[in-house]
């Protein structure tokens, strides 16, 4: 601190010692990580610090003692022409301060009439308090505040957070004031009176169970302050303590300084508290998936439902929305036209034209009366001897004429040899436009069954030229789908493919239908349809699953271990866990 100018008599000594003490001596050995050389590293360094930075002793003492150096207080009649210098406020000297006393003269005369306090004529000193022997102290029989008996074991704040709002309809102050109490408000314990005579070993209590209309709400004591009543003259006097600190009791109170608090916010806090009561099982398994977020702000809906008597007491918070299955809106069809406010169209049945216009469902024409059907061809194909002529040349010419007459009708195209989808002229499913009738569609698919049709349709007619056993002769398809001829050089196929196809065509229709259902190699064209009434074809994965054996796997695992089995009875002496009293367990066993 700098020296106060004009007052050299106060501070004439410097701070610090002239000689460096060994306590503050330091060098590189003591502080090797010190980057800057400390002022107390050596004696020369310390003297340089003393000369560069001179710190004088603080001017404590007369100015800071009782009275201190103050201007002289004189009445107006004794005011001098010039202001006198400052003197000591009291006439006694103070020892132990850093400066000199000023002045060292006679004590300063004190003038008590300069202030409002007057000198007392009763007491010999200036004390305004009466002497203890002469004072009369009377007892005041009033309750005084005391500390809670268990105040040292009570938390100063709330240990657990609370969601209760003072404006709550079911647990707030309004619910505590009404009679009878709602079931959400706890009541105070019953008053009990102890009737016990001194020396009697038994304890007698009288418990007063009031009616519901006279019960009181439960409150925590000590929120304001505890008061104790003074005892009588004969008994011991209470010990007075200072006023105890205020106890923080978890009682609800109206916060008048918070204008935002309202019944709507109290309802939100109540719903937030009820939402924490839900278990994880209730939240995740609702039957329709996980629970949606809860509607916390439903004060208006509750008020309307309470007026209409639609809800009970303290209802649980509801979800904001519920998952509902909504089918997709079809782009076309009857439902789409109804949604678009358009007129629905009448169903049009498309009838396929018959191959022969002269044939009727009951009566055939003259040509088809002697031409065998495809079933007859398949049945007779294996029994026709070689070299037998079935019809003459006139019949063949008539067949050619009939073909030329029926050339305007559309005939099926040529099929590949190995393509089963073209062999069976199957329409998988008609086009579905009414997508809302999902249940009808499901039962329709279940009842639908793929009916295999023969390769040679009964409506087609076949040439009887060169008709031989299909197992021996090789025939393949030509642009004319109903005629068979010998293979040419350009239409030559492999022997295995032709044999497979002819063998497939040579089977009867009933046997062919059974093979379609039972044979694993011959599967439906559309594959397996879920929920269509047909079992799903098994794969090799099920066989692999059934072939696994846990016992066999364990046996193979034990056989793969070439080392000897470990004997658990052997004593192990290595490791940190085998140290006892600083010695290894090896020395105890051996």
From Swiss-Prot:
GO cellular component: centrosome; cytoplasm; motile cilium
Annotated positions of the Phosphotyrosine modification: 442
Keywords: Cell projection, Cilium, Cytoplasm, Cytoskeleton, Flagellum, Isopeptide bond, Phosphoprotein, Ubl conjugation
Modification Phosphoserine, positions: 407, 422, 485, 547
Modified positions (Phosphothreonine) in chain numbering: 219
Tissue specificity: Predominantly expressed in the testes.
TM region positions: none
Classification via InterPro entries: SPMIP4
Pfam family, one: SPMIP4-like
Crosslink site: Glycyl lysine isopeptide (Lys-Gly) (interchain with G-Cter in SUMO2): 427, 545
Main location class: cytoplasm
Keyword Metal-binding attached: no
The keyword Ubl conjugation is assigned to this record: yes
Cellular location(s): Cytoplasm, Cytoskeleton, Microtubule organizing center, Centrosome; Cytoplasm, Cytoskeleton, Flagellum axoneme
Function recorded in the entry: Microtubule inner protein (MIP) part of the dynein-decorated doublet microtubules (DMTs) in flagellum axoneme. May serve to reinforce and thus stabilize the microtubule structure in the sperm flagella.
Family annotation (PANTHER family): C5ORF31, CHROMOSOME 7 OPEN READING FRAME 31
Protein name from the UniProt record: Sperm-associated microtubule inner protein 4
